[in-house]
Amino acid sequence: MADFVGSWKYGHSENMEAYLKKIGVSSDMVDKILNAKPEFTFTLEGNKMTIKMVSSLKTKITTFTFGEEFEEETPDGKKVMTKVTKDSESKMTQVIKGPECITEVVREVVGDKMIATWTVGDVKAVTTLLKA
């Protein structure tokens, strides 16, 4: 998991608007999220990871233990249950159970890029972060 540790800046995304609409985000909030251009800092302490996201919308800090389900809040204020598992030192899978749907997010570090693939039903979006 050491591959994730450090600072990451937003690179680009593909099909994120369709994904956000599929999970029930309002049109107004979709526009705000798409223009937020977040930066992330990942830290690791034992089996706990902390992800700090700073964007024009807000700052969000999420700390979790791999393999344990926890409650978190989405950017549009919905409460969801989330579980993150380690797939390898450079890959993790997050399952988000929300009121309308279940989303799977697979994050993988490849060189100086972190590629996150967001899947809900038949809709898939990809976000690429660049090592800062």
UniProtKB/Swiss-Prot annotation:
Family to which this protein belongs: Belongs to the calycin superfamily. Fatty-acid binding protein (FABP) family.
Annotated InterPro entries: Calycin (IPR012674), Fatty_acid-bd (IPR000463), ILBP (IPR031259), Lipocln_cytosolic_FA-bd_dom (IPR000566)
Domain of life of the native organism: Eukaryota
Keywords annotated in UniProt: Acetylation, Lipid-binding, Transport
Molecular functions per Gene Ontology: lipid binding
Species assigned in the record: Fasciola hepatica (Liver fluke)
SUPFAM superfamilies: Lipocalins
Record-given protein name: Fatty acid-binding protein Fh15
